Amino acid sequence: MKKTFWLSVIFALCLGTATAQNFRKDNKIFEKTTDKQEKEYLQFLYDYMPLSDLADYSGEFFLNQVRYAIKARETFSWGRTIPEEVFKHFVLVYRVNNENLDTARAYIFETLKDRIKNMSMYDAALEVNHWCHEHVNYKASDGRTSSPLATIRTSWGRCGEESTFTVTALRAVGLPARQCYTPRWAHTDDNHAWVEVWIDGTWHHLGACEPEPELDIAWFDAPAKRAMMVHTTVFGKYDGKEKKNFEHPLYSKINLLSNYTTTKNLEISVKDTDGKPVENAQVAFGLYNYAEYYPLAKLYTDKNGKAVLETGFGDLMIWLRKTVRQLLPWQRLTPTR
């Protein structure tokens, strides 16, 4: 146990040292551009990126991400129609999941720009998914999510890798996209990930690397109607209209279930033995799957002892937990307000 502890301490110190060194070095990347917009977008990425990205990748890598995102917006007609908030969170951001990062944005942009340049936003999204299907097919796997270019090289990936690849491809050509995820199905032992793409002000879904003649058509349409949770992670401080299951200073988990089925607000009230509301009690919502109650969401009660989850019509197991430990500032946020 002690050995594990000290190994963890050494790893944390090494990561902290590498991160600090990389930050000092990458701080100079702002001197390599005089463009005000490039600096603004670069600052946005540095403000919200994971520390591991800061330690593992160079400033030049992130500056190229910014430049190709801007290039895509200026190249395609739909670039001018995308609101700044949507562009920053769903085009500019280079990361989709926990994949290793690579230069897929530049490669895909150069590969697809002539193929889709004269298309409408809607048709371009369909065409990008056709291109993704030409290069990648489904195969189950359990390892860490592969990078987009690695997925192309192997020509296969599980749904999480296919959707990471497809979101990256859509963003590379300036189409706002996000990976959607149901942590566990309500009807069978499994989960699934797919893609939503923003077209003219509306989010549409599609099966990653599973092209259809239209958007909002996918094999999972029927099971999604029985789902109890569909969510996505949005990097950065996001103020969209979607409900938040969880909010951290660096990212949010937003609830997308209402895009797929009829929902209801499940309100939980927590009181102590004296009948007084309990603030900051953790409320975990579990769905039975794979012989366990898998946590779909964890919320914290507000000052009135209440937590509200938007969910589907089905059965959930609810756990309540209240500890005496000091909560961190971000844990005091009430994502249900």
List each language-model region with its residue ranges:
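Hydrophobic/aromatic-rich core segments of domains that either
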Residues: 114-119, 124-130, 141-149, 154-245
